[in-house]
């Protein structure tokens, strides 16, 4: 018998013993056949061909195999015996004892006597009958035990991982509860200390009414010694600050970096790194932990309010002889903990220092900072009181003026006055609201902004795409593992091939889920010098392995269904129906967990600086045609070559756009006015600007209808389907979804077939027919995943990107002569990359073209990983090598 038939017979060992499996080539007059004897053994029978009709064709063969199966159940090693019969002679047992045909001796082994009795009842013949029976241990018994061990180990690992995560979270939970229950003095160790002179001073300051609470009609308002007390307060606080000056480094004039929806901004210091909240700042590792109450607003904005219990502000000049347009800094202290903090206030539009006090802080000693234009020594008591009374109310989070072009910046700031209050002076320091603006510091990059935003999202309870995929796969794996064992038990009891095949399919699903989880973990590993792109394509390899596993198992099921079409067995339709119904419900739950929607591997969605808004207009780019840039003085060009977007004031060639207006509408009006003066504006086309009297080079396509993004030199239409709410779909999650969908359809078919068998038991052929149909359906459902995975591995153009339209858009940029060697591929799902050569007119416009092309690819086509090389007509020979010509064959070069 071929080895494949033998292996398959052991794989289907739950079949009835009389199920015929295969033949062995005849050897003379002897024929050998092998039969499955259940989960423990198989029986190979060798008999004489001459007695085939007289013995083996009768129904006694089934009885012989049934009796031999009982012997096989107790057999753990191979046993062979020969039964012979000659006329009226008795049958000799394998142990050498004789068994008379009329009856059985009490000492004879029951199994052997039963087999001998059936042989003795065979038709009397004159020749000798040789029947060799060999009981072999099941080949798959060891593999079945191994598979049980593997499944048990996986379940144990999953249980241990959940238990370990729960145990790791217990100390944090208990410590947080304990820290809330313990007094503040005991948290820091030691007994409660008596209040110092500093805290006594703060408590006295709390008793003094706020300058805003005074009314002009109060007769005693002018006689209260507020100014003198404020001076004494200032002197005391200066002494306290002098003692702690070593612990608070002075801030430099470096710009701070901020990220969308981040509650803290960072400012580089001369000695360390100071992390500043919108209203307070402290040096990491120096100041003790402050006690700040955080409360979540009930509105949609979800802005966190950070309130200090008691603060006392004292002025401190941190720039010394720096230019006057520097941010004012305050030393703030907590009356109960003597913690020193720093509060930064931004300059106003004129370059001066605004005098402001946080309205949400507790009433405290409010001292205005020293101003170069108005020395403090010249202020009298009335002037000081007037200045204190004129303190404006400061919002909890000031909006970033330059971030007005970013929709995420205006989230939570609906007050027009608040938007008009703040602008950036010459110092270029970011401040106020640190949520909703892209990084403006020279060392900040878009990647760091995205990483900080992902950290913020994790802290706020938001899940990233990978975390969401991992959670779904873990839940689906648990459901799949539990129900797989249910179907295995029910399939053995009901003798249903459809249930067993569905259980096998669930086993493949479980393996696919585990492979997908492993691929997700590997894809998060960062790149190294040997793997510069990282391990993103491990996700693709995992999806391919999962698809191949489905194909192999489906082929086995089709093979088994073919045999059941020939000889349908008896099936318990009732048990099969209820098990299939339960499986349908379980698969419905799994498909709900893994529910995804696909937009193709290249149809990634645009996001605003890691935020939840779509891309908004750029405002800080200058037109190269109207105002050529100087190559040596263009930080925007250097940033563009480094892969950055040039929309912040540090990168922008000019700061006029940053200061043009107080809100987004005013900024647009001012920009329109400048466009009218310089002759720009009017009607613009895709990929570049066009004058008022000039038509676009080609009309907008139908797919270009949607929101627009305009700048001084680039006008691109953003597709409406680039909605930030739709994240790109993970390929492993889609593969798992197809697994679960195939199981759901197969369970529905099994339920229908079981209902028919339950109604008409003689319709047992519906079981293999159902298996055959839905196995083929599962094969076809995997073709889409296979196609996209091969497209990524072969570095094909992503499905959602039109390379020809992209090349035309690049050609329409001002100063571009030719575009060749354009390559667009995907590192993994949702990670497209681009590389191309752009031939420009001259060196003067090279940097401008590079910047525009980078922004065009990143904003319209959502290709964030771009490599654009600018060439000149004189260097065209370097791009005419054999490798370049081979790559450019599939696409013709477009010329102006």
Curated annotation (Swiss-Prot):
Disulfide bonds: none annotated. This is Vacuolar zinc transporter TgZnT. It is a multi-pass membrane protein. Gene3D superfamilies: Cation efflux protein transmembrane domain (1.20.1510.10). Belongs to the cation diffusion facilitator (CDF) transporter (TC 2.A.4) family. SLC30A subfamily. It holds the Pfam family Cation_efflux. The lineage of its organism: Eukaryota, Sar, Alveolata, Apicomplexa, Conoidasida. Residues 82-104, 205-227, 255-329, 621-707 are annotated as: Disordered. It is found in: Vacuole membrane; Cytoplasmic vesicle membrane. GO terms for molecular function: zinc ion transmembrane transporter activity. Coiled coil: none annotated. One of its GO terms (cellular component) is vacuolar membrane. Residues 82-91, 303-322, 656-680 have a biased composition (Basic and acidic residues). Disruption phenotype: Conditional knockdown results in reduced growth rates in the presence of extracellular Zn(2+). Residues 210-225, 255-266 have a biased composition (Low complexity). It comes from the Eukaryota. Vacuolar zinc transporter that is probably involved in the transfer of zinc ions from the cytosol to the vacuole for intracellular storage. Plays an essential role in extracellular zinc tolerance. The chain crosses the membrane at residues 473-493, 503-523, 540-560, 574-594, 738-758, 763-783. Residues 494-502, 561-573, 759-762 are vacuolar. Residues 1-472, 524-539, 595-737, 784-896 are cytoplasmic. Keywords: Cytoplasmic vesicle, Ion transport, Membrane, Transmembrane, Transmembrane helix, Transport, Vacuole, Zinc, Zinc transport. InterPro entries: Cation_efflux, Cation_efflux_TMD_sf, CDF/SLC30A.
């Amino acid at each position: 018998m071929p080895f494949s038939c033998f292996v398959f017979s052991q794989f289907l060992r739950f079949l009835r013993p009389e199920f015929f499996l295969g033949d062995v080539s005849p050897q003379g007059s002897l024929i050998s056949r092998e039969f499955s004897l259940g989960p423990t053994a198989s029986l190979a029978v060798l008999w004489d061909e001459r007695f085939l009709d007289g013995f083996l064709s009768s129904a006694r063969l089934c009885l012989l195999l049934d009796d031999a199966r009982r012997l096989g159940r107790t057999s753990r090693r191979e046993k062979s015996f020969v039964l012979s019969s000659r006329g009226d002679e008795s049958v000799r047992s394998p142990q050498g004892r004789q068994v008379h045909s009329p009856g059985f001796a009490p000492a004879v082994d029951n199994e052997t006597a039963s087999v001998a009795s059936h042989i003795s009842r065979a038709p009397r013949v004159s020749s000798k009958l040789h029947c060799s029976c060999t009981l072999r241990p099941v080949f798959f018994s060891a593999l079945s035990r191994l598979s049980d061990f593997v499944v048990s180990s996986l379940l144990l690992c999953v249980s241990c991982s959940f238990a370990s995560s729960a145990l790791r979270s217990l100390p944090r939970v208990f410590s947080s509860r304990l820290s809330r229950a313990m007094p503040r003095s005991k948290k820091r160790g030691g007994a409660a200390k008596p209040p110092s002179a500093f805290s006594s001073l703060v408590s006295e300051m709390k008793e003094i009414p706020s300058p805003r609470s005074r009314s002009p009609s109060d007769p005693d308002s002018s006689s209260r010694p507020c100014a003198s007390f404020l001076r004494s307060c200032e002197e005391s606080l200066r002494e306290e600050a002098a003692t702690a000056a070593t612990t608070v480094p002075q801030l430099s004039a470096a710009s701070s970096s901020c990220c969308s929806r981040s509650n803290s901004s960072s400012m580089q210091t001369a000695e360390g790194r100071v992390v500043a909240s919108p209203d307070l700042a402290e040096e990491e590792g120096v100041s003790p932990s402050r006690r700040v109450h955080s409360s979540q607003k009930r509105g949609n904005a979800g802005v966190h309010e950070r309130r200090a219990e008691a603060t006392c502000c004292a002025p401190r000049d941190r720039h010394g002889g720096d230019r006057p347009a520097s941010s004012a800094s305050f030393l703030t202290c907590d009356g109960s903990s003597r913690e020193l903090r720093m509060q930064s206030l931004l300059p106003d539009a004129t370059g001066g220092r605004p005098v402001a006090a946080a309205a949400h802080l507790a009433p405290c000693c409010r001292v205005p900072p020293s101003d170069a234009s108005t020395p403090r020594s010249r202020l009298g008591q009335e002037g000081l009181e007037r200045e204190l009374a004129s303190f404006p109310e400061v919002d909890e989070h000031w909006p970033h003026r330059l971030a007005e072009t970013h929709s995420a910046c205006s989230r939570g700031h609906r007050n027009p006055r608040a938007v008009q209050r703040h602008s950036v002076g010459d110092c270029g320091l970011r401040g106020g609201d640190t949520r909703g603006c892209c990084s403006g510091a020279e060392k900040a990059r878009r990647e760091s902004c995205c990483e900080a935003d992902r950290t913020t999202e994790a802290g706020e309870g938001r899940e990233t795409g990978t975390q969401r995929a991992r959670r779904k796969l873990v839940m689906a794996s648990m459901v799949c593992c539990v129900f797989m064992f249910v179907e295995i038990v029910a399939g053995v009891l009901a003798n249903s091939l459809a249930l067993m095949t569905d259980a096998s399919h669930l086993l493949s699903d479980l393996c696919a889920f585990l492979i997908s989880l492993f691929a997700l973990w590997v894809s998060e590993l960062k790149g190294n010098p040997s793997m510069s792109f990282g391990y993103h394509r491990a996700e693709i390899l995992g999806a391919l392995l999962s698809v191949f596993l489905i194909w192999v198992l489906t082929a086995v099921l089709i093979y088994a269904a073919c045999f059941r079409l020939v000889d349908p067995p008896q099936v318990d339709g009732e048990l099969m129906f209820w098990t299939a119904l339960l499986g349908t419900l379980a698969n419905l739950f799994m498909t709900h967990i893994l529910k995804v929607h696909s937009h193709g591997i290249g149809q990634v969605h645009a996001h605003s600086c890691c935020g939840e808004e779509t891309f908004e207009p750029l405002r800080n780019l200058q037109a190269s045609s109207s105002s050529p840039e100087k190559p040596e003085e263009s930080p925007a060009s250097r940033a563009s070559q480094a892969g950055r977007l040039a929309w912040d004031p540090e990168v922008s060639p000019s700061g006029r756009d940053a200061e043009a207006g107080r809100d987004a509408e005013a900024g647009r009006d001012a920009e329109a006015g400048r466009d009218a003066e310089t002759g720009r504006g009017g009607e613009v086309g895709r990929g570049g600007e066009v004058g008022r009297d000039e038509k676009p080079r080609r009309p907008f396509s139908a797919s270009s209808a949607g929101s627009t993004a305009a700048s001084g030199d680039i006008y691109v239409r953003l597709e409406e389907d680039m909605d930030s709410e739709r994240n790109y779909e993970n390929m492993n999650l889609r593969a798992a979804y197809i697994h679960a969908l195939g199981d759901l359809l197969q369970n529905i078919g099994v339920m229908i077939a079981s209902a028919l068998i339950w109604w008409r038991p003689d319709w047992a052929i519906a079981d293999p027919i159902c298996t055959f149909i839905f196995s083929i359906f599962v094969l076809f459902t995997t073709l889409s995943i296979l196609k996209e995975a091969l497209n990524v591995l072969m570095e094909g153009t992503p499905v959602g990107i039109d390379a020809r339209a992209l090349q035309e858009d690049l050609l329409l940029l001002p100063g571009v002569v030719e575009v060749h060697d354009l390559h667009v591929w995907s590192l993994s799902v949702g990670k497209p990359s681009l590389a191309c050569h752009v031939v420009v007119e001259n060196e003067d416009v090279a940097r401008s073209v590079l910047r525009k092309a980078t922004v065009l690819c990143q904003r319209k086509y959502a290709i964030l990983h771009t490599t654009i090389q600018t060439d000149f007509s004189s260097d065209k020979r370097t791009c005419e090598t054999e490798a370049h010509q081979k790559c450019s064959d599939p696409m013709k070069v477009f010329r102006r």
